[in-house]
From Swiss-Prot:
UniProt name for this protein: Probable isoleucine--tRNA ligase, mitochondrial
Residues making up the signal peptide according to the UniProt record: none
UniProt enzyme class: ligase
Organism field: Ciona intestinalis (Transparent sea squirt)
Keyword Nucleotide-binding tagged: yes
Main localization, broad class: mitochondrion
Cell compartment(s), UniProt: Mitochondrion matrix
GO biological process, one term: isoleucyl-tRNA aminoacylation
Record-stated family: Belongs to the class-I aminoacyl-tRNA synthetase family.
Superkingdom classification of source: Eukaryota
Length: 413
């Protein structure tokens, strides 16, 4: 293929690779590849055996392996400025200007995200896909279109990263040799840790000092700092919950969750169960929609569109703005909602529900008013109602003949 010269390190050459992630309808049609810093780039790198060595550390700073003069510079500020200066020095910067473009941001901090590779633990879901598909072929979902959605998500998921770097969580019980980096994880070390956790709790992993069995030299190893993905935690809940009196796992009659769990709890439970016992952990899936705001947006504290049910039922600090509609109005709104679809909620919607409840109350009051002093002992028995009905018809017909002066020879009912 085509070979290009590096714009900064002129002695280096770069191989051109064709891919559909770049096209001529947007930009120049040519983009750089950073296999260690992007999902698409990583996929292309794997396909073409490109290096995935990272050039940015976990603090967002350039590392020495990319260029000594860039080491320690933050990529979004001084690092960018240094790269621009290096391009200028080599006379390879044709134009520079600021412009707006799409870029991923963290939804919590609202700060830009930079992706980089790191060593993680994975489950090869491709090896479980066929077994998982076979296991859910007999599963019933409510609504009935859920299986296809779940199958689509399974087919798109080739690997499942089950490790996370957090300050809390269930640790992955692996040890690393301090010199060689070789990992230590076997039945002996697991059983030893199980006994420690049963005695001291899960925090023993972070606080304990004698975590290895006596046949190992603990001074040569260090504990891992990774924790399990919370979806792996919840995904094996069936192993604790669904055990019978003989300690055998069984299938749950129902798993009930939101529609987003086709790629979450439903899937993680399926994969772990199929991998460990060869069957799905459930017989049926019940899927519900979500409660959205009046405009159909997901409610979020950061956006400020959360509807407080306590304010709707009991009223807010300002009764004129937030009157109390009562619990029955909220119950009515729930009762008339479709469980499988997203539903909207707002003050206006609950006000309408309260009006519906008031109409029902008025109707009930009317009926109760008509039943005032009602005595069930005075109710005419059902068999006697026929005689009364015949008598009424006779009297009605007789009255008509009398008023019309038209008597028949034989008057009967």
């Amino acid at each position: 293929g085509m070979i290009c010269r590096h714009p900064i390190y002129l002695e280096r050459t770069v191989r051109m690779i064709g891919s559909d992630i770049a096209n001529t309808s947007k930009g120049t049609g040519v983009v750089h590849i950073a296999p260690a810093h992007g999902m698409d780039d990583f996929g292309i790198g794997q396909k073409h055996n490109l290096s995935t060595e990272s050039s940015v550390n976990s603090d967002g700073e350039f590392m020495a392996n990319i260029a000594p003069n860039l080491e320690g510079k933050f990529i979004f500020t001084s690092g960018n400025e240094a790269v621009v200066e290096m391009l200028k020095e080599e006379m390879n910067l044709f134009h520079e200007h600021d412009y707006k473009h799409s870029y991923p941001y963290d939804w919590r901090t609202k700060q830009p995200i930079f992706v980089h590779t790191s060593n993680q633990w994975f489950v090869d879901t491709a090896m479980l896909a066929n077994k998982a598909e076979a296991a859910i072929s007999g599963i019933t979902t409510y609504p009935d279109n859920g299986i296809s959605s779940m199958l689509n998500r399974l087919q798109l998921r080739s690997y499942w990263c089950i490790s996370r770097q957090r300050a809390w969580g269930l640790p992955i019980p692996v040890f690393y040799h301090k010199e060689s980096g070789e990992l230590l994880l076997n039945e002996s070390t697991i059983q030893h840790l199980v006994s420690l956790v049963l005695k001291h709790g899960a925090d023993i992993w972070w606080e304990g000092t004698e975590l290895l069995p006596t046949q190992y030299n603990a001074d040569e190893y260090e504990r891992g700092r990774d924790i399990l993905d919370i979806w792996f935690d919840s995904g094996v809940s069936w192993d604790c919950v669904l055990r019978d009196s003989k300690n055998r796992t069984t299938q749950a009659d129902f798993y009930i969750e939101g529609k987003d769990q086709y790629g979450g709890w439903f899937q993680s439970s399926l994969l772990t169960s199929v991998g460990l016992q060869g069957v799905a952990p459930y017989k049926n899936l019940m899927v519900h929609g979500f409660v959205l705001d009046e405009k159909g947006q997901k409610m979020s504290k950061s956006i400020g569109n959360v509807v407080d049910p306590m304010v709707l039922t009991n009223g807010g600090k300002n009764p004129q703005r937030d009157p109390a509609y009562g619990a029955d109005a909220l119950r009515w709104w729930v009762a008339e909602s479709n469980v499988h679809q997203d539903v909207h909620i707002s003050t206006t919607i609950i006000k309408s529900a309260a009006e519906s409840v008031q109409k029902i109350r008025n109707s009930v009051r009317f009926m109760l008013g008509n039943l005032n002093e009602f005595d069930k002992m005075k109710i005419v028995p059902t068999p006697a109602m026929l005689i009364l009905d015949l008598r009424y018809r006779f009297e009605d017909k007789k009255l008509w003949y009398v008023t019309s002066m038209n008597y028949p020879l034989n008057l009967s009912v």
